[in-house]
């Protein structure tokens, strides 16, 4: 029997758009990509990471100056996959705004913090969680030592990224990430992961004037 959740996730809504050549149907995510909106949803892993990186590069090629909006609802996942997205966000020329909807945990919180300064947002009932990287390995003692050292190196690198984007001291970041640390949207704002908690979309000044 198929997992009902998996079945639901595969039912991507279609939207129809009128063009001068007639009607054209898009899946909802492709239509939102036209508006420069990218969704980071579910576990962060290699396949998902590759799709996000490809979308970022495509939108940069389309317009290297126009803002990209990234909506995040993720429990985190593979560190290297998350860092591929992070590095691409920093590499491309367009500013990337981030918005947490639901949760941004582990690597999800790092991507949330990595948005353009003053363009990092959270909805009021979102949950943010930060912690140090974890991993497991079995094999010869020497190999286990090598992998343990690599995890420590990753921990240091991730701490430095949080320092860069939150403005916190290295010690404060190390203390905060020692265990699973759950933050409300307001606490994430105070910690520097987001810049603002919003419950309404800001009014368009052009529409307001009209």
Curated annotation (Swiss-Prot):
Catalytic activity: Hydrolysis of proteins to small peptides in the presence of ATP and magnesium. alpha-casein is the usual test substrate. In the absence of ATP, only oligopeptides shorter than five residues are hydrolyzed (such as succinyl-Leu-Tyr-|-NHMec, and Leu-Tyr-Leu-|-Tyr-Trp, in which cleavage of the -Tyr-|-Leu- and -Tyr-|-Trp bonds also occurs)
Enzyme Commission number(s) of this protein: 3.4.21.92
Coiled coil: none
Main localisation: cytoplasm
Residue positions of the active site: 106 (nucleophile), 131
Tagged with keyword NADP: no
Keyword annotations from UniProtKB, A to Z: Cytoplasm, Hydrolase, Protease, Serine protease
Subcellular location, record wording: Cytoplasm
Annotated GO biological process: protein quality control for misfolded or incompletely synthesized proteins
Species whose genome carries this gene: Afipia carboxidovorans (strain ATCC 49405 / DSM 1227 / KCTC 32145 / OM5) (Oligotropha carboxidovorans)
GO molecular function terms attached to this record: ATP-dependent peptidase activity; ATPase binding; serine-type endopeptidase activity
Protein name, as recorded: ATP-dependent Clp protease proteolytic subunit
Pfam families: CLP_protease (PF00574)
Subunit structure: Fourteen ClpP subunits assemble into 2 heptameric rings which stack back to back to give a disk-like structure with a central cavity, resembling the structure of eukaryotic proteasomes.
């Amino acid at each position: 029997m198929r997992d009902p959740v998996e079945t639901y996730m595969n039912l991507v809504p279609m939207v129809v758009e009128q063009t001068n050549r007639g009607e054209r149907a898009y899946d909802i995510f492709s239509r939102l990509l036209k508006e420069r909106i990218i969704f980071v949803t579910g576990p962060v892993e290699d396949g998902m990471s590759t799709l996000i990186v490809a979308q970022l590069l495509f939108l940069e090629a389309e317009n290297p100056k126009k803002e990209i909006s990234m909506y995040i609802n993720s429990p985190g996942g593979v560190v290297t996959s998350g860092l591929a997205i992070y590095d691409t966000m920093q590499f491309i020329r367009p500013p990337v705004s981030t918005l947490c909807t639901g949760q941004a945990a582990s690597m999800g919180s790092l991507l949330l913090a990595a948005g353009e300064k003053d363009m990092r947002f959270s909805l009021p009932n979102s949950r943010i969680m930060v912690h140090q990287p974890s991993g497991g390995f079995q094999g010869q003692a020497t190999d286990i030592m090598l992998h343990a050292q690599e995890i420590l190196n990753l921990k240091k690198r991730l701490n430095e990224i949080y320092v860069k984007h939150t403005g916190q001291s290295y010690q404060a970041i190390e203390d905060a990430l020692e265990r699973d640390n759950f933050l409300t949207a307001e606490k994430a704002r105070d910690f520097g992961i987001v810049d603002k908690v919003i419950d309404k979309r800001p009014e368009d000044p052009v529409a307001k004037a009209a």
